Amino acid sequence: MRHGHGLRKLNRTSEHRLAMLRNMMNSLIEHEVIKTTLPKAKELRRVVEPMITLAKEATVANRRLAFDRLRDRDSVVKLFNDLGPRFKARPGGYTRILKMGFRVGDNAPMALVELVDRAELAEAPTDEKSED
């Protein structure tokens, strides 16, 4: 039985909801951190974590399944070449949701969704002066 396996409706039609989640998955895979509302973040976690688990085993069938769900070649390449090997030893829990307070316009709860082991792109530069 599949009782209780549905996603939140998020006040959208099914086509709009699936397209929105697909776009959010692609953005998260590309940028490794995105800002969205808390209910969308919780739904995004439910769809992106199985994709990363799929990418841990790089077979042609898994690539085709990932492309069927993502519909973006660059995201599939990054998923299988970068994220799959990075999370190979981790048994799940690839994303982190951080609450960010409330949005100014409509007071919606906001959240930051990020991949757990993401490489810090902007490292703090050290101000060491060489004495010449």
UniProtKB/Swiss-Prot annotation:
- Top-level taxonomic group: Bacteria
- What's one GO BP annotation on this UniProt entry? translation
Q: Which UniProt keywords apply?
A: Ribonucleoprotein, Ribosomal protein
PROSITE patterns from the UniProt entry = RIBOSOMAL_L17
Give the residue range of the signal peptide: none
Q: Which SUPFAM superfamilies match?
A: Prokaryotic ribosomal protein L17
Is Isomerase one of the keywords?
no
Which GO CC annotations does the UniProt entry carry? Answer: cytosolic large ribosomal subunit
Entry's family note: Belongs to the bacterial ribosomal protein bL17 family.
The annotated subunit structure for this chain is: Part of the 50S ribosomal subunit. Contacts protein L32.
Could you cite one Gene Ontology molecular function of this protein? structural constituent of ribosome
Task: Kindly give the Pfam families that the UniProt entry links to this protein.
Answer: Ribosomal_L17
Know the name of this protein? Large ribosomal subunit protein bL17
